[in-house]
Amino acid sequence: GTLQDLLTARLDQLPQAKRAAQVGGALGRVFPQALIEAVNAHAASPIHLPALDPLLQALVQAGLLTAEQQGEQRLYTFRHALVRDAAHQSMLERDRRRLHAAIAAVLQAHFAALCDSQPELLALHQEQAGLWAEALAGWERAARHAARRSAHHEATAHLKRALALLARTTDGPDAAPLPGRDATELRLQLLLSGLLITTQGYAADQVRAVYDRALVLARGLGDEAALHKLRLGLEGYHFMRGDFARAQAIADEVTASLGDHPEPQARLQASWAHANILFHQGRLPEAVALTDRCLADYRQGGHRATTVQDAGVMCLC
C-alpha cells in the first residue's frame, strides 16, 4: 500500500488515540494543548474524549506526534504532514465539518488574540466547516491584514482563496445564494488589482484580467465610482505597455463620463492622465499647459488628505 495507507494503519492500532489525532489533524500540523482541550470540551464537537492527555502522550510514544514546551504552553506537532493528513481524512466528511465548526467557535470565543494576529486561521476552519459567508469575510479580513503588513503575496493568496470560494458558492454542488454577491466580488477584485500592480506591475496580464472582470461587475451594478477607478486603471495598463493610442481613447472615455460638472478629484485624475500621455508622446507644450492647469486645480482643491496617490506630486514628476 501507499505511505498514507501505512500511516492510517498505524493510527488504527491506537483506536482511542486515533480520535485525539483526528481532532489534532483538524487543528493543523502544529497545535497547542490549550486549543485541543477547548475543542474537545466544546458542545458542538463530534468528538469528546474523557481523558485527552494520556491519548496525546500515547501518540507521542508511538512516534506520531512530538511535544515541546514553549513558555507556558505545550505544543504538539505531527512528525510528518502525511500523518496529519491521514488523521484528518480518516473522519467522515459530516464529522469533519462539524469539528471545523467547533474549532471556529472555540477560536472566536477563547482565542481572540490568535484570530486577530492570524485571521486566515479562522477563515480556513470556517471554510472547511461549510460556513461560506463567514469564511468569505474571513479571507477578505486576512487579505487586508496581510496587505497592512506589506505581505503582498500573502494578501494576494488570501484574496484568490476568497474569490475561489465565491465561485464555488455560485456554481456547483456547494452553490448557495450569498447576499450582495456581485458587490462583494467587485470589492475583492478591486483590492486584488492593487496588490497585483504592486507585485507584478501595471502592465501584467493578470492585472488586465482582473480589470476586465471588475468592469463587467461594475457595469452590472451601475457603480460609477468603481467604473471611474477601473477606467483609470485600464488607461494606466495600456500606457505602461506603450499603447498610447488606446490609453488616450480610455482617458477620453473617462473625461466624457464625468459630465458637465465633474467631481474635482475625478477631473484632476483624468486631466493628469491626459497630460502624462501627451508628455510621453513628445507633445511637450500641450503636456506642460495641461499639467499647469492640473496643478492650479490641485492647489485650489485641497485633496492631499483624501488620496493615496497625490495628484499634485504626480504632476510635478
Roles of regions detected by a PLM:
Residues 76, 97, 101, 116-123, ...:
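Start-of-helix signal in alpha-solenoid helical-repeat scaffolds, especially tetratricopeptide repeats
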Residues 1-157, 161-169, 174:
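Short secondary-structure boundary elements
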Residues 97-101, 114-119, 154-167, 201-212, ...:
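Helix-turn-helix repeat elements of alpha-solenoid scaffolds
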Residues 93, 97, 132, 149-152, ...:
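TPR-repeat structural position
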Residues 61, 105-109, 143-144, 163-175, ...:
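Amphipathic alpha-helical segments of tetratricopeptide repeats
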Residues 132-230:
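Flexible inter-repeat linkers and adjacent short helices
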Residues 69, 110-116, 128-129, 149-151, ...:
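Short coil/turn linkers that connect adjacent helices within long alpha-helical scaffolds
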Residues 86, 124, 141-147, 164, ...:
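Tandem amphipathic alpha-helical repeat scaffolds
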